[in-house]
Design a protein with these regions (language model features):
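Cytoplasmic helix-loop-helix junction between adjacent transmembrane helices
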Residues: 137-173
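A late C-terminal transmembrane helix in Major Facilitator Superfamily
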Residues: 372-408, 416
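Helix-to-loop junctions at the C-terminal end of transmembrane segments
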Residues: 94-106, 307-319, 403
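Conserved MFS/SLC helix-loop-helix module at the cytosolic interface between two early adjacent transmembrane helices
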Residues: 93-131
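Helix-breaking motifs and short loop linkers at transmembrane-helix boundaries and internal kinks
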Residues: 74, 106, 127-132, 161, ...
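Extracytoplasmic gate region of multi-pass secondary transporters
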Residues: 62-63, 256-307
Length: 458
């Protein structure tokens, strides 16, 4: 009797458990990670936006006080430039390995570690006001930014599989608002409350919200499991294969290379950083230095309304080709207008450039969770971020080389023009939205889970 029962039951208890774990990792979205309760959705969306805010406020609070740091620590211009470029370099180098780490320990744990590194680095750099500790702790907090930013997309993919565009847009809003608030409020806060030359105190000021957010994250963030493949015994693996054949085949989804996404989003970042980096020098060279403050302020201010506006329609347009193509066309027109029209029109052109850049950034960071399967999101996100910031770092440098070579100020913006064309071409080559298959994946999850239950009951 026992032998007959054993023959009819293909899985032992241990193997059945292994099989269930495999299903959770094999199917795109795990049912137990979805957030379905409305009030919890609101809380988690707010957490995601706050993570974005703090990932930028800590580093964008530095440029306004950079002259004070340079004066007090005796930095050269090269050292000053390295301090501001270090977060971009770390993002370019660390995002890819961070994606692999997300697969191993899960996105929630990676954001936790990232926020801890960010808060610790932001606070500790205020304690030793010398060059080496400042660079070391900037490196530390930048590593925390890379880990947290890479982990957000896989988390959104797990928690909000049907609202990826909207939630990623909220995260993008947090990033952009963090940039704007830190850049605009750091000096007034320092002068009014901390002391006219108390630049070290601003480090502490921006670290406090990070610590508070870390506590909220540990308390309120839902669970998120690692997505690395699970090794099964041969019996369980054979049974999985048999049952999978009787269930609905996995959804075929569009394939897109990380190189494609990385270069496309890197081109967009190059447009933004290239304009920010060369507006002042260009205007000085053409004897229009008085236009620089307005041009820079408009370029950065245009991002916020564009990002907030995209948020309202993000769920409808996320994953579509035309926003990337349209943004590239607008950028080509704007950079041509910047170079060939009178300087008095500069605010018009930088408004178009800033708004288009924000649109592409908001929709672009939604592409990895839309295009990749559940277990591939972290890796694709990490590779994409690394390539994005590598391209963004190289672009402004290339503009300077061209200026030195040809002795023409306008050629510094040639990389921006090429990046705009690249945005059009690579945007047109994206898979169609219909090929993403998220709805089909959701049905596949339910069918796979149903198969687990039916086989276990046998």
């Amino acid at each position: 009797m026992k032998e007959r029962h054993a023959a009819e039951c293909p899985l032992s208890c241990r193997e059945a458990r292994e099989w269930e774990i495999m299903v959770k990792n094999a199917v795109p979205v795990s049912e137990d990670e979805r957030i379905t309760v409305t009030w919890r959705k609101v809380i988690v969306c707010a957490l995601v936006a706050l993570v974005g805010f703090n990932l930028r406020s800590v580093i964008l609070g530095v440029p306004p006080i950079l002259p004070l740091i340079q004066h007090d620590l005796g930095f050269s211009y090269a050292a000053t430039g390295l301090l501001t470029a270090l977060p971009i370099l770390v993002l370019a180098c660390a995002a890819w390995p961070s994606g692999l780490l997300v697969e191993r320990i899960g996105g929630r744990a990676c954001v936790t570690i990232g926020l801890a590194l960010l808060g610790a680095g932001a606070f500790l750099r205020a304690l030793w006001p010398t060059a080496l500790p400042l660079f070391f702790f900037t490196l530390l907090l930048s590593l925390g930014i890379a880990m947290s930013q890479t982990a957000v997309s896989p988390l959104v993919r797990s928690w909000f599989p049907a609202q990826i565009g909207l939630v990623i847009a909220l995260f993008s809003d947090g990033l952009i608002i963090g940039e704007a608030v830190a850049a605009g409020a750091t000096v007034p806060i320092m002068v009014q409350f901390l002391g006219r030359d108390a630049w070290r105190s601003t480090f502490v000021f921006w670290s406090v919200p990070v610590v508070g957010l870390l506590a909220l994250w540990l308390w309120l963030a839902p669970a998120a499991h690692a997505t690395a493949p699970v090794q099964l015994s041969s019996t369980a693996d054979t049974t999985l294969s048999t049952i999978s054949q009787s269930s609905t085949p996995p959804v075929k989804r569009a394939r897109v290379s990380a190189l494609h996404l990385g270069i496309m989003l890197g081109a967009n970042s190059l447009i933004y950083f290239g304009m920010n980096g060369w507006i002042a020098s260009y205007n000085q060279a053409i004897h229009q230095g008085g236009m620089t403050p307005l041009a820079l302020a408009t370029l950065n201010a245009a991002q916020l309304p564009a990002s907030l506006g995209v948020t309202l329609f993000a769920q409808r347009i996320a994953g579509r080709r035309w926003p990337f193509i349209a943004a590239g066309v607008v950028c080509v027109i704007a950079i041509a207008g910047w170079v060939f029209t009178p300087a008095v029109l500069e605010p018009v052109w930088v408004t178009l450039l800033g708004g288009s850049s924000a649109l592409v950034f908001t929709l672009g960071i939604a592409l990895p969770p839309l295009l990749a399967s559940h277990e591939e999101v972290a890796r694709l996100t990490g590779i994409t971020i690394s390539l994005t910031y590598a391209v963004a770092f190289v672009g402004p440098f290339l503009g300077g080389v061209l200026w030195d070579t040809f002795r023409l100020p306008a050629v510094a913006f040639l990389p921006v023009a090429l990046a705009s064309v690249t945005l059009i071409v690579l945007g047109a080559l994206l898979p169609s939205r219909a090929a993403f298959g998220l709805a089909g994946e959701a049905r596949h999850v339910e069918e796979a889970n149903s198969s687990v239950l039916q086989e276990h009951e046998r």
